[in-house]
Amino acid sequence: MIPTIIAIYLFAVGYGIFRRFNMGLARNSRGQQLRRYLIAAVQVVIPMLLMRQSSFSLPAVCALLTATLWIVTYNVLYDKTNRQTSPDYDNHMDIAFGIYIFGWLSALQGITAALSPAAGIVTGLAEAAILIIPLAHIGYYSVYRTCIDDAGMIPMLDTYASETVEYVRSLGIVKVVFVVAGFIGLTAALVAANWQTASPADTAWWLYAITAAVFAYFTVYIWKPRHGLFVRTGVVNLYIDVRDYFRGSRRYRTGMEQRLSDLSVTRNAEGGKPHTVLLVIGESACRDYMSAFEPDQPWETTPWETAMSRDRRHFSFFRNAYSCAMQTVPALERALTERSQYNNREFSDSVSVIDIARKAGYRTSWFSNQGHIGKNDTSATLVASTSDRAEWTLSSVEAQYDSSLIDFLDTIDPTVDNFVVLHLIGSHFNYENRYPESYAKANGLRTDLGDVECYRNSIHFTDSVLQKAFEKASQRLNLEAMVYCSDHGGIPDMRRSPRFLGFKMVRIPLWTYLSDSYIDRHPAVAKALADNRDRYFTNDLLYDLMCGIFDIRSNRYDPSQSLASADYCYQRADMLTYDNRIRVADDDLDKA
């Protein structure tokens, strides 16, 4: 009876916390987690059944409290911190870890109790160690009134021992003694609770053997280094991301010194008024759902871009553009640098578009509505961090829709040459969270038809953001050139997959804008872009396109790789995607 009650409790608390303290959950995520938590809750009471524990014992209570603290802490604190500023988040690994850790502790207690009542000290110490993270997180929140994030984790990993000692001293001896004594007392209580509990004397040896096997299964599932539950929990995953960012940053910055030491850049057309070149990087936008590229849509999804596509003097829309990869990291680490599918350069050895712009005399600014540090953000963040100015909306108190990026343009100095990058969240899943509900109502967009329609709505909202960026930059910053390109595409009616599921995953929008003054000063570039409208392109050549639009000569730029050059050499048969594995020429086989 007691194992059944515990299973129901763990499932109810876990799923209840998941639904209440996560935002913008996709429909399939709700059902998926319901099934996962139900299966987990059943599995974790198996050790209790094997050890014939039919009543609430102190070890069971301790394990249950440990599990509950893990289930609740990160989700609640993250929600309290981000509910007003983030339209969606799905934190489910702490809940899964909390449920499974109950089974792991129960199995550990059962095994150690068979050896000796005193062996319960192992379980008590394990529980104390496991509680360090949630208790520390609660303490962090009580001091700073915010959930720990990369801004809080970075100082922890980038602090010398002497600085740590100085910080501890600043807290005051009373607080330090209270915290240390409290944790020692908690550890002693957990050890005492597990000390005297022994297994029933008539427990068969084979039940211990099965319990040991269950314990081994839980151990691998929870603690394996690469894909275990523990390394995917909120705080631990954040720690790993920040650690990896520091490692990557050191490599990238070390390589930067070598890259820039021999980088030469010369503008072909000097002089002219201060102006701005604007690059907008989209997210998960597939041109198949954009009216400006594919007019046969259920409703107009890109009203502004469609109108601009008719202005062929200033705008060039490239209808044969593809991404080089299907995920953000491999796509952007190529798009933003020399590295491409067509050379053997390493990311850390490659000059970036920011390097080129700065060397050409532009003041560089990067504004992002994406994450700052994480497995999906690191390469872009490393490039962004070399800008003269880099800011993320995650530090803003406003809701993080892409429209919030427009305000950054008001802070740019119009008296100097500027290169500005806006990195959108675009049409990243979950699509219905990419635009405000008020926007959908104001524009008469359908929101009741599922993922595909919500995806089209996100495309519509991105169109409005592009219009606002264009108008603001034109009015304030003497916009001379603008480029819009997505990192990769997407198939909104299919579950996301690391496998290649069709060319919609890589069909992306690409267009350029040139002002009258730019066309007058750079006629060859303007003619090349117009002449190359129907040429094939993969976005690992975006770096070369931007070099061409800057109209520079450089030892790290080959004009034959740039759509902005009459020497552009690539033909349809040359183009590759999915990290060199798929030929763009095969797109005819998957036109649907």
Ranges and model annotations:
Residues 324-338, 498-552:
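Substrate-binding rim/cap in mid-to-C-terminal beta-strand-loop elements of soluble/periplasmic
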Residues 305, 526-531, 550-589:
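Polar, surface-exposed loop/tail segments
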Residues 102, 162, 348-351, 355, ...:
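A structural signal for well-ordered alpha-helical segments within the folded catalytic domains
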Residues 105, 264, 406-410, 443-482, ...:
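A long, amphipathic alpha-helix that forms part
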Residues 1-234:
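Transmembrane and membrane-interface helices of multi-pass
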Residues 210-279, 284-443, 538-539, 544-569:
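Active-site-proximal alpha/beta segments of enzymes that process anionic O-linked groups
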Residues 293-300, 474, 478-479, 483-523, ...:
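Histidine-centered active-site microenvironments of extracellular/periplasmic hydrolases
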Residues 436-450, 518-527:
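Flexible internal linker/loop segments at domain or repeat junctions
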